[in-house]
A protein has these predicted regions:
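An N-terminal boundary/leader segment
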Residues: 2-20, 24-195, 422-424, 480-481, ...
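A short helix-breaking turn/cap at a secondary-structure junction
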Residues: 124, 131-136, 331-414, 458, ...
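Short helix-loop capping/hinge segments that flank enzyme active sites or metal/cofactor-binding pockets
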Residues: 128-143, 214-233, 391-400, 442-498, ...
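Glycine-rich, small-residue loops and helix-cap segments
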Residues: 160, 215, 255, 259-262, ...
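Acyltransferase
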Residues: 161, 166-172, 198, 408-431, ...
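Conserved hydrophobic/aromatic pocket- or pore-lining residues that grip, position, or stack substrates
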Residues: 171, 193, 215, 221, ...
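N-terminal, positively charged, Ser/Thr/Ala/Gly-biased leader segments
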Residues: 182-233
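Short glycine/serine-rich loop/turn segments
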Residues: 212-352, 400, 438, 446, ...
């Protein structure tokens, strides 16, 4: 993503990390591990001498100016001023802060705009109405069964024309046959899956049907803990990490009777699509990556290796692979789905959501994984109002006129807006202030660097496969130079942006935006609004696409003639109103008529 690549190149750098570990007076310089913090109370102190000249150089980064006397005072006193910070990291009373410990300040999207938080958030009513479509007869071809949406698979399993064990074996065979091309699976849970499938069949035969996910095989992004099954976060130094308990979402899916079949790939520590096993590829265009960081969920779902998957998003990690791989990606409202037992990248931004082959499937999964959990202080009880049979005519859909005229918008995006108009929605042009939205990423990078402070300072981050300017190792290191003042100002700006989005949603019921529009990826993730990415057509590409910054030494493949790949639009809804964007997405999906298309060769 452009915002990930560019932000720290242009971000202001803080004064805290320019300091080594010396007092104002001259001291001997000693060797130290790169990236290691100053040793509290050490003699001689670690690192180079900090002098008034150090602060003079730092002023260039911070765009501030001190007088000579102020520089002298800062150089003489900085160690005393920051002693408590250093002691927390390296002193005799140093304190380890577990990944599960969230900051004391908790982001609540509704509260940020002045809304009252009651016992339950969201719509006035709890409702879930499935479509009335008949699943039809069970196909004779295994591939046709594998690609069927959960909405159909669940009907076949409920009526016992299809067993969970047979369906599980179909997906296991497809993984064995196709995943060598995709590298979407980190850990195959074959024995676990077959045992769960047999249990599901036994329960259903006994009349103990748990609901539409009962017996349905799925995969989860490998940042969700699974009891006694390794959870690697896509990183080499975590490849043998085996949790003692399931993540809350995995436990909820287990309670729904779903069958965990695979732990799916993610870009290492949730960035892009390269993990310790290689790059996850796009089944529609195997010469390019699947995008990330929910690369495995996107690729495996698109290739019919699982019935559905669970991805995560911090700044585009559901939207982007859903677009690239041509699947449906639902990013829930921040706080709707508990993240207990999930890898933390950014406490105030991380979200978990379904990636499926259809809109109704996404809502079936969302219903199962929603809810509050004591382990996630940001999770809230929220009603879900979805009626697949309800009309969409009369709704107001906002759009940004300028964005629809320029890249990354395409004719497919513009046609989708016209389709909504034909379906009876009223298009309403909306605007946002011309603000530097990417500066919000101060919060993201500071939180991410805090989450991974230990591996940054002990050097393990250097073992990650991707060591380029826009990968986490460099970003974590650079984030040590961010200003605490800029972090607070970014957080305050976040509230202003949330108020602007609240203003827009007083005028419209939902937004339609080009999926990869950087400004809206940033804005909607920081404000916590839900999004639904729906495939509505195809585009032709002459070159493979990549999440990474261009590298002249490794040019991307080009194609003549151009290749046809999926393309979709993204709908953004009011806070906790996933039901409205799903209703509209379902109508748009039917109008487009491309959701059932499959990648050639899979």
């Amino acid at each position: 993503m452009t915002q990930r690549r560019q932000f720290l190149i242009n971000a202001p750098l803080g004064l805290l990390a320019v300091a080594g570990a010396a007092r104002g007076e001259p001291v001997p310089q000693v060797a130290d591990t790169p990236g290691a913090p100053p040793t509290f109370g050490a003699t001689p102190p670690v690192g180079p001498d900090v002098t008034p000249a150090t602060f003079a150089e730092a002023e260039k980064l911070m765009q501030v100016r001190l007088t000579p006397a102020e520089r002298q005072m800062a150089a003489a006193s900085w160690r005393v001023s920051l002693a408590s910070t250093m002691e927390r990291r390296t002193g005799p009373r140093k304190l380890a802060i577990e990944d599960s410990v969230a900051p004391a300040t908790v982001w609540h999207p509704a509260a940020a705009v002045g809304a009252q938080i009651g016992p339950t958030a969201g719509p006035a009513h709890e409702r879930f109405v499935r479509s009335r479509n008949d699943a039809g007869p069970l196909p004779k071809n295994d591939a046709d069964i594998a690609y069927a949406p959960v909405a159909k698979l669940s009907r076949w399993i409920e009526t016992r024309v299809l067993t969970s064990e047979r369906l599980t074996r179909i997906y296991l065979e497809r993984i064995q046959r196709f995943d060598g091309k995709l590298r979407s699976v980190i850990t195959l849970t074959e024995d676990h899956a077959l045992a769960r499938a047999r249990l599901a069949d036994k329960e259903i035969a006994a009349g103990k049907y748990r609901g539409p996910l009962h017996g349905i095989p799925y995969g989860v992004k490998d940042l969700l803990d699974t009891k006694d099954i390794r959870t690697t976060w896509g990183a080499e130094f975590y490849r043998d990490r085996v949790p003692a308990r399931d993540a809350a979402v995995v436990a909820k899916l287990d309670a729904a009777g779903a069958v965990l079949i695979a732990k799916l790939s993610l870009g290492a520590l949730a960035l892009n699509d390269v993990w310790f096993g290689g790059q996850t590829m796009n089944p529609w265009l195997p010469e390019e990556g699947a995008s990330g960081s929910s690369a495995g969920p996107g690729a495996a779902t698109a290739a019919g290796l699982v019935a559905f998957s669970i991805g995560s998003e911090t700044g585009g990690s559901i939207v982007s692979p859903a677009m690239r791989c041509g699947v449906t990606g639902l990013r829930p409202t921040y706080g709707r789905v508990p993240r207990t037992g999930a890898m933390t990248l950014c406490w105030s931004l991380d979200k978990l959501g379904p990636m499926t082959r259809g809109v109704e499937d996404a809502m079936l999964v969302l219903k199962a994984i929603s809810g509050v959990d004591a382990g996630d202080v940001a999770s809230v009880p929220a009603r879900l109002d979805f009626d697949a049979t309800a009309k969409v005519a009369g709704l107001k859909v906002g759009y940004f006129a300028g964005w629809m005229k320029e890249a990354p918008a395409t004719d497919v995006d513009r046609a989708a807006l016209e389709s909504l108009k034909k379906l009876g929605l009223t298009p309403v042009p909306v605007t946002l202030p011309d603000w530097p939205y990417q500066s919000l990423n101060t919060v993201l990078f500071a939180e991410a660097a805090a989450a991974f402070e230990e591996i940054t300072l002990d050097g393990r981050v250097d073992q990650l496969k991707a060591q380029v300017p826009d990968a986490w190792p460099n970003l974590f290191r650079e984030a040590r130079f961010l200003s605490a003042v800029d972090f607070v100002q970014g957080d305050r700006m976040r509230r202003k942006v949330a108020l602007e989005m609240a203003r827009i949603f007083r005028e419209v019921d939902l937004l339609l935006v080009p999926s990869l529009r950087d400004e809206m990826l940033t804005i909607s993730n920081f404000t916590g609004h839900p999004s639904l990415t729906v495939r509505t057509g195809s585009v032709m590409v002459e070159q493979a696409r990549s999440d990474w910054a261009p590298n002249p030494a490794q040019p991307l493949p080009t194609f003549k003639p151009a290749r046809r790949v999926p393309h979709g639009v993204t709908l953004i809804g009011r806070l906790f109103d996933e039901g409205t964007i799903a209703r509209v997405g379902l109508a748009l999906e039917k109008a487009a008529g491309v959701a059932g298309e499959r990648p050639p060769g899979f």
